[in-house]
């Protein structure tokens, strides 16, 4: 997939202007070379992959080996996230009880269901998920017995006004049309419902790739974890307000990671992974060899490896409740007020009034 060098005709998702121009060439394994475009309208500057990827592109990227440490792409060490999601669910369940004693909760982008499974065991809420990865949906159903719609949110056609709480953690940066996605989220939420949304700080996300483009012409920076949209605080708040949400709170989190990604300290900068152009094209040619929904036995084998990885990373300390509070305190110290943008991620709480 090769980006044209001129302006894109399709309008910017944030400001509505059509002047999106190529900014940084990046590599998306199994898809090819793509371009992060930038809106050149004054005071906008929104960055996004253009032309837009397709749903088949996303399905190829989020195949079963997206969660495999041996993969050239995807989320490395995902099994080790299991313990973090146990902690997150413990404190989220507490917040849910303070909000309402019970209700319906939807996680969009539920991955392998680590958070949903833990929430189901820590609260009286009814939980379900939406996940584009067929392996992710399969794993969640088989390991936790939960309802998961293997789809994008827009294609799931969920009932209007049906959820009391929505979680979108590390999700909005992956969707093809963020404004349309937020409108659909608003539609399925009941009046008074809330959403917890966490998405990367676009400047911190793009910064390492902007620096890497000055390297060898035979190498391309890899688009880590397949992010396709890059939001600043201003972009995010504008989209949320214009799609009907009331913002209740916003934090900038991940101070240390953000400083490294932004390159604030010259000798302490994060460097992105790079891939040779020939190796990138090899991943595209191998796209047809990915597992399909019919590969149930391969799914079982991959799931068993994931279970063993979780078990190997387990320890009594990580299951100890005082350790939960210690990690919670560390995260609080790694957060910034909403007016500051040095962190890696934005953490937003919104409500449908």
Regions found by a protein language model. Give the residues of each.
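Conserved N-terminal segment of class I S-adenosyl-L-methionine
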Residues: 1-161, 165-169, 179-182, 252, ...
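Short N-terminal helix/helix-N-cap motif within the alpha/beta-hydrolase-1
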Residues: 176-180, 207
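A short glycine-rich, Lys/Arg-flanked "PGG" loop and its adjoining helix->strand segment in the class I
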Residues: 179-194
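Substrate-binding/catalytic lobe of Class I Rossmann-like enzymes that use SAM or dcSAM, i.e.
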Residues: 234-298
């Amino acid at each position: 997939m090769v980006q044209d060098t001129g302006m894109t005709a399709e309008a910017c998702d944030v400001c509505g202007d059509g002047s999106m121009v190529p900014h940084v060439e990046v590599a998306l394994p199994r898809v090819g070379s793509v371009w992060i475009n930038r809106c050149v309208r004054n005071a906008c500057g929104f960055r996004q992959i253009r032309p837009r990827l397709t749903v088949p592109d996303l399905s190829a990227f989020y195949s079963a080996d997206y969660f495999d440490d041996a993969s050239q792409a995807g989320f490395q060490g995902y099994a080790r996230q299991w313990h973090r999601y146990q902690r997150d669910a413990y404190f989220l369940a507490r917040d849910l009880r303070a909000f309402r004693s019970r209700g319906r909760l939807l996680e969009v982008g539920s991955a392998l269901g680590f958070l949903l499974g833990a929430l189901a065991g820590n609260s009286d809420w009814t939980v379900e998920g939406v996940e584009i990865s067929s392996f992710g949906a399969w794993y969640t159903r088989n390991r936790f017995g939960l309802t998961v719609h293997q789809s994008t949110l827009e294609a799931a056609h969920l009932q209007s006004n049906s959820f009391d709480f929505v979680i979108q953690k590390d999700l909005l940066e992956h969707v093809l049309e963020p404004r349309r996605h937020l409108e659909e989220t608003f539609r399925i939420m009941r009046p008074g419902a809330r959403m917890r949304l966490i998405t990367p700080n676009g400047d911190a996300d793009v910064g390492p790739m902007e620096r890497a483009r000055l390297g060898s012409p035979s190498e391309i920076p890899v688009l880590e974890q397949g992010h396709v949209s890059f939001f600043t605080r201003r972009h995010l708040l504008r989209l949320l307000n214009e799609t009907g949400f009331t913002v209740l709170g916003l934090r900038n989190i991940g101070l240390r990671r953000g400083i490294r990604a932004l390159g604030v300290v010259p000798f302490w900068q994060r460097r992105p992974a790079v891939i040779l152009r020939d190796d990138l094209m090899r991943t595209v040619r191998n796209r047809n060899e990915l597992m399909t929904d019919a590969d149930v036995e391969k799914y079982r084998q991959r799931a068993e490896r994931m279970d063993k990885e979780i078990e190997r990373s387990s320890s009594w300390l990580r299951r100890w409740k005082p350790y939960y509070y210690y990690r919670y305190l560390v995260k609080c110290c790694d957060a910034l007020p909403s007016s500051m943008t040095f962190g890696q991620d934005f953490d937003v709480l919104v409500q449908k009034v």
